[in-house]
Amino acid sequence: MNFRYNHTPFGYKRRQTREVKVGDVKIGGNNPIVIQSMINSDTTDTKGTVKQILELERTGCEIVRFTVPSQVDADNLPSIRQELKKAGSKIPLVADIHFTPSVAMKAVEYVEKVRINPGNFADKKKFAVRDYTDSEYDEELERISAIFSPLVLRCKELGVSMRIGTNHGSLSDRIMNRYGDTPQGMVESALEFIRIAESLNYYDIVVSMKASNPQVMVQAYRMLASRFNELKMDYPLHLGVTEAGDGKDGRIKSAIGIGSLLEDGLGDTIRVSLTEDPVLEIPVARLLAEKFNKRIVKPEPVRGYSEFRNPFTYERFYSSEIKVGTFEAGENHPVRVETVLPFENSNSFLANIAKLYQYGKSFSIEPESILIDSPSPDQLKEISEAAAALSIPVGILLGKNVSLNEKLQNELRGFPKVVFDPFLQFQDGKKMLSFLQERQNAGLYTEIHTSGAKIESFKGLPETLSEIGIKNVLFSIESKEILYDYRKLGSILSQHEFPILLHGSFSNPEEALYDSAIGIGGLLIDGIGDLIRIKTPKMKDIEEIFQLSYDLLQGTRLRLTKTEYISCPSCGRTLFNLQETTARIKSRTGHLKGVKIAVMGCIVNGPGEMADADFGYVGAGPGKVHLYRGKEIVMKNVPSEVADEKLVELIKKHGLWQDVINV
């Protein structure tokens, strides 16, 4: 199988694509990454729609999308256009179409771009199970071509571009029956429509592969890029994690999916989907885009590293077990969290530990491993005595100027883990190996930690350690290029079983949130990493960083320590105030560890886009809600004023309710 989907996994180079014009905005080619969003007003409300479009334009949005669900909405587009012209707005508009080809034919007259969903443009979702023969499948493609071709020809005639936007949760029954609910199904769904467009010599196409799970979303885009390479297609990519939610969780999920793909050189335009006011999406999108619009591509090629992953599926990078008392990591254990703390004295240190435990009680999380950051050697005795009062391991990170002499090595035997840089602490390789062997003989662990600039020097070390039987070793890196350098480390360690600790050092919590989501999150969804450790310089940030570590694991779906929400960003199809409803449901259910709840504004993003949610709350009509258990409707047309309570009753009925524990 061909795993090639970008220039290289070990360095940055943007994928070359054709340029597609959306009005005066150019997507792809050598143009900067374009920022876009979607309004949530009713498209028949001219005043409200124009107001939101202008607000987004002022905030820095470059393209605006709105839903056109019916002929009535399409009929109002001339009024919207007229009012925008009066206001001096030139921002390109995108009509979002589901289910209604006839509406698309009207909308195309008044917009610069049309978005169609190949899963429902010519198909109705019936969840039917059947086997298609090849001839029956071909007949279906001919039927789709007959429905889709008129829109393609009209777009071509008017100079209107198109996004073929696949959503993981709304694949057609035909695709589902042949490929399953998979990234491959998403890719093939889009390719079917692209081929129809190409048969009509239409190429002004942008493509997207959206999912609410960043792992699925990333795999689908990579697979699409790989197929594009095979088919000699060069269409620009529109990136987005759909139904990402709100607050920090929504930003983390978006950064994991969008950011890690941009690091891979994939992506020409982005939309951050938050269940918030659309204008709040723009600063997040700008932050992500600017990282790469300003990126300097290093001229030297990356050599000496080979692909060790299957980038199209999740597979945990196998490592041997780490066991210190009751602490277990590596092997098949969940990815663990290590927290960095300073040490001034025993009292303040133990108080900080107690503070973390107290904080964690409210969120069903707790400290798992502690690392003391660069203590002075004369503090080690006091640290050891304080650590003896704890049930979790306490390790030591040696400062850069500390020499690992014999006296210090003896003092470090009181700590289950020591982190050191072999290129700073040892001048003699034999002495380093002797140090590692002595610690292993005592049942202790050592973390070999160095800068990304020195990673080449790691080559050959795993083989040496394996030859002399040293196993109690972890590897980590200090780098601003977290994704690339840890992939290099993974390549070096790919034939060995040494655990990997994902380390990120950041200047403040905001930088930590976005850069750790892109770097550490991007590695986690590839199965790389047995522990994570996030570090900022200020003690006041510790609780926030502690929470962020677990939020990253939640966002990658590797450890669910709180309720997981899948909520759409709202649009003109939404049948209730989505932000208020989501906040209300969170207030009732936010303590349900590991339960997945979808809050969806309408039937378009309902059964499908709920993905793997345990329960769903989906708008069914004005003042009416459908409640789901999985993908099955269990309560229809529930009045919205009692729907929250009925949802709680449904959760209780299925045994997933827990009473709130007051801390």
Swiss-Prot record:
Keyword terms: 4Fe-4S, Iron, Iron-sulfur, Isoprene biosynthesis, Metal-binding, Oxidoreductase
Keyword 4Fe-4S: yes
Record carries keyword RNA-binding: no
Annotated EC: 1.17.7.3
Enzyme class of the recorded protein, top EC level: oxidoreductase
Residues engaged in binding [4Fe-4S] cluster: 568, 571, 602, 609
One GO MF term attached to the UniProt entry: iron ion binding
Function: Converts 2C-methyl-D-erythritol 2,4-cyclodiphosphate (ME-2,4cPP) into 1-hydroxy-2-methyl-2-(E)-butenyl 4-diphosphate.
Stored PANTHER family: 4-HYDROXY-3-METHYLBUT-2-EN-1-YL DIPHOSPHATE SYNTHASE, 4-HYDROXY-3-METHYLBUT-2-EN-1-YL DIPHOSPHATE SYNTHASE (FERREDOXIN), CHLOROPLASTIC
Protein name: 4-hydroxy-3-methylbut-2-en-1-yl diphosphate synthase (flavodoxin)
Organism: Leptospira borgpetersenii serovar Hardjo-bovis (strain L550)
Gene (name only): ispG
